[in-house]
């Protein structure tokens, strides 16, 4: 029997994002007869932490890395030398905040380059394959700190919308054996932005498991929709990317037009207080509910009339694929990659503003036959794609001499 290949996946945490969920799906489909799999998190936290398969070795976080990313230092300082990491973190984080015209992620790039890269020690294990399963800091850690025969980095979004500085990422992408993204549109954007690394770009879709999702959807929601209203569902991090500020403004317009609806938003994030204040300001407490993260959102998806995605940008949305598996019509804003996943047979694409979102929803409210037709079309297909696991093995077992088709 041939020796198992050693592979490590690196990601910040397992909070409820699309990249994190797709990693869990991938790990559940992995061939553990061929691979010995380690998982390294910068923070051992998140909604999906208890869904890591038992065959995966969830590593202890190296002490220096832990000090750079942990949320609290209570009980973490073991020795005087630890203070250098705490100082580096606070100095780096504080100084990059004053940089003009820099996004949060671009500031993290500078923080890694000027502060973290020199402070964090190399990882003490060696692998056949190392995978940075998210852009930005996991990528830099894998390429700077892990010894491996092959190194692959994932970009889970339309790169132009990430806020990252391409000049900083170029030398890293040159060092990587492959740069993997999740849709044709995202791949083309990477090739245009990084022509020097264009031959390294691979497109491999996220894994979505239809059987598992349908089984979970059979449960009942713990905070169910009311039956006397249109039922709208959105799922995503409460961040600027997901556009829930536009969603709440659209809800305000719909209420003014006299419609009765309940819009449940599943997710947590940095804009929770701001969005809650917005809901209160518009008097929408009876119409829009922020219910937090749910380890099983699929009963809500099964019970809704349609899924609403109000994003400003996406890579290839895991949530849209999951909605399609449950035969749920979709209303989505016209972000650059939306046509990779959606057409007018199964959903409605609207402009990226509150008025267009409200108008699209009003159309669905007034014409239930549209929703019925979309649902019938969705029911004719199986949108699961566990067979795509072969693309991952093709990458991991290839000589990475060029792009995949």
Description of each model-found segment:
Residues 150-156, 160, 174-216:
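Donor nucleotide-sugar binding/catalytic pocket of nucleotide-sugar-dependent glycosyltransferases
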Residues 20-25, 230-253, 259, 270-276:
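A conserved mid-protein helix/loop that constitutes part of the nucleotide-sugar donor-binding site
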Residues 13-16, 33-104, 201:
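N-terminal strand-loop element at the rim of the active site
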Residues 255, 356, 370-385, 391-394:
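A short, well-ordered alpha-helix in the C-terminal region of glycosyltransferases
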Residues 329-332:
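Short hydrophobic beta-strand element within catalytic cores of glycosyltransferases
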Residues 293, 312:
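Aromatic "clamp/platform" in nucleotide-sugar-dependent glycosyltransferases that forms part
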Residues 322, 335-344, 348-349:
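Short acidic/histidine- and often glycine-rich active-site loop of Leloir-type glycosyltransferases
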Residues 344-355, 363-368:
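Conserved acidic donor-binding segment of nucleotide-sugar-dependent glycosyltransferases
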């Amino acid at each position: 029997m041939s020796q198992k290949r050693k592979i490590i996946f690196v990601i910040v945490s397992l909070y409820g994002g699309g990249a994190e969920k797709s990693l869990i799906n991938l790990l559940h489909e992995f061939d553990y007869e061929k691979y010995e799999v380690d998982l390294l998190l910068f923070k051992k936290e998140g909604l999906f932490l208890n869904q890591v398969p038992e065959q995966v070795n969830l590593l202890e976080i190296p002490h220096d890395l832990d000090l750079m990313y942990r949320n609290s230092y209570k009980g973490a300082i073991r020795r005087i030398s630890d203070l250098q990491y705490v100082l580096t973190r606070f100095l780096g984080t504080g100084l990059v905040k004053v940089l003009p015209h820099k996004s949060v992620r671009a500031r993290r790039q500078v923080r890694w380059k000027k502060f973290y890269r020199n402070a964090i020690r190399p990882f003490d294990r060696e692998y056949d394959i190392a995978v940075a399963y998210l852009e930005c800091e996991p990528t830099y850690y894998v390429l700077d700190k892990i010894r491996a025969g092959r190194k692959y980095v994932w970009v889970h979004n339309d790169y132009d919308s990430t806020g990252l500085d391409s000049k900083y990422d170029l030398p890293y992408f040159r060092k990587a054996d492959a740069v993997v993204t999740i849709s044709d549109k995202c791949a083309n954007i990477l090739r245009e932005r990084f022509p020097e690394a264009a031959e390294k770009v691979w497109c491999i879709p996220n894994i979505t498991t239809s059987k598992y999702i349908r089984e979970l959807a059979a449960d009942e929601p713990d905070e169910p929709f009311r039956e006397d209203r249109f039922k709208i569902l959105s799922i995503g991090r409460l961040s600027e990317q997901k556009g829930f500020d536009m969603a709440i403004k659209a809800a305000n317009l719909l209420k003014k037009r006299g419609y009765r609806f309940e819009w449940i938003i599943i997710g947590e994030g940095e804009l929770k207080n701001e969005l809650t204040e917005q809901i209160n300001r518009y008097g929408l407490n009876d119409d829009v509910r922020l219910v937090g993260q749910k380890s099983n959102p699929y009963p809500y998806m099964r019970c809704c009339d349609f899924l609403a995605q109000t994003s400003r940008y996406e890579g290839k949305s895991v949530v849209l694929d999951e909605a399609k598996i449950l035969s749920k019509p979709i209303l989505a804003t016209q972000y650059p990659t939306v046509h990779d996943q959606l057409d007018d047979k199964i959903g409605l694409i609207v402009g990226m503003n509150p008025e267009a979102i409200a108008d699209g929803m009003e159309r669905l409210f007034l014409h239930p036959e549209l929703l019925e037709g979309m649902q019938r079309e969705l029911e004719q297909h199986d949108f699961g794609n566990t067979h795509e696991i072969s693309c991952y093995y093709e990458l991991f077992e290839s000589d990475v001499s060029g792009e995949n088709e």
